[in-house]
């Protein structure tokens, strides 16, 4: 077939209807929608000034129909990725080579597994074409982070093109026909159940009350308060926040049903907030913060309130985001993730391949070990 590649400096160069027509049936497909990617760009979270240059890959047929697309960025650093390659960059620098710029296909600042290559139909030539196009770009390497939904043909094409798989682990909560939160607690071991009840009791004794809002119930003042919490959390760790208030307002404007905000109140008013993204029967824990600090409120806002809500709403899974082994004590289970990497320099590619082989074995052992320390009773 006669395909033509075109790179986009802005997602709005293609109609939302054309881009979104490529989204597959996947729990996280909505997170690579036109509206989500546009929110990052239009709110100035991306661009040359941030070290994220938009360069989305698109493929068009002879009739000028969009047949495939992939979010793509030219990166001048490794911030906001949650798959860590700083050591690779340092190794390049020690040997006098430039690691940056590199090419990255990912959902910016968001460690959620999902589709990256979007296709109208399953033409077996699309994946090899995309890989060849990336190789032709000027840069040290290309990376596809938190990729999910690849088929056997995709895997074969990536391996033949010398792409390397890297595994990681996150922690997800799964619905198991729980009727309510108490039913969920009863599935846990006694020690974990006791600990959670104690933590919730202490939050209650401090006079913290929670509500959740979504869709039309969310107003600009709710977002302004959430952003104050979000920004304070980043500043307390000595970092500037990646996202702007305009991003959240833009996302709410285009996809009001996407966000679920949990708000904690003390006697002075709102004191903390956590934000989840929702897509169909799956939820994704994203951000948390507080303007006044209380013990155990983080667990209530980020885990217990969302789990209660998920059981009521028929949500089948809450993805807990990056890292956080402490989530296991609160009923989250380990879940593997994968990313793919291609390095142009043969010697560095060989070294990274050996490193990833060892790291992969370590991750296998870690996942096995984590399974043995689940919070649930041995017979569930």
Where are these regions (language model features)?
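N-acyltransferase acceptor-side catalytic subdomain
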Residues: 1-380
């Amino acid at each position: 077939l006669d395909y033509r590649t075109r790179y986009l400096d802005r997602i709005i160069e293609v109609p939302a209807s054309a881009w979104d027509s490529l989204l597959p049936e996947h729990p996280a497909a909505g997170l690579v929608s036109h509206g989500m990617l546009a929110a990052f760009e239009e709110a100035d979270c991306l661009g040359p000034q941030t070290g994220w240059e938009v360069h989305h890959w698109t493929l068009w047929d002879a009739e000028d129909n969009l047949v495939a697309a992939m979010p793509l960025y030219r990166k001048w650093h490794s911030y906001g990725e949650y798959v860590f390659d700083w050591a690779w960059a340092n190794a390049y620098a020690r040997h006098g080579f430039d690691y940056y710029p590199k090419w990255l296909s990912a959902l910016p600042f968001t460690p959620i597994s999902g589709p990256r290559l979007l296709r109208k139909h399953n033409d077996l030539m699309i994946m090899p074409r995309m890989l060849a196009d990336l190789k032709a770009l000027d840069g040290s390497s290309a990376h596809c982070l938190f990729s999910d939904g690849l088929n056997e043909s995709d895997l074969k094409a990536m391996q033949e093109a010398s792409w390397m798989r890297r595994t990681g682990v996150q922690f997800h909560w799964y619905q198991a026909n729980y009727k309510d939160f108490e039913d969920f607690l009863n599935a846990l071991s006694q020690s974990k159940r006791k600990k959670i009840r104690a933590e919730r009791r202490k939050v209650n004794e401090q006079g913290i009350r929670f509500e959740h809002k979504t869709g039309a119930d969310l107003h600009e003042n709710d977002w302004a308060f959430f952003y104050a919490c979000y920004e304070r959390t980043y500043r307390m760790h000595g970092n500037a926040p990646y996202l702007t208030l305009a991003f959240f307002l833009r996302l709410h404007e285009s996809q009001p049903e996407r966000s679920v905000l949990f708000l904690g109140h003390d006697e002075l008013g709102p004191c903390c907030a956590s934000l989840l993204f929702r897509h169909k029967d799956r939820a994704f824990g994203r951000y948390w913060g507080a303007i006044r600090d209380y013990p155990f409120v983080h667990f209530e806002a980020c885990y217990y309130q969302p789990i209660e809500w998920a059981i009521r709403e028929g949500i089948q899974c809450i993805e807990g985001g990056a890292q956080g082994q402490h989530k296991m004590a609160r009923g989250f289970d380990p879940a593997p993730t994968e990313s793919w990497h291609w390095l142009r320099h043969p010697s560095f590619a060989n070294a990274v391949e050996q490193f990833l082989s060892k790291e992969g074995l370590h991750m296998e052992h870690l996942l096995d070990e984590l399974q043995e320390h689940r919070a649930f009773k041995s017979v569930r």
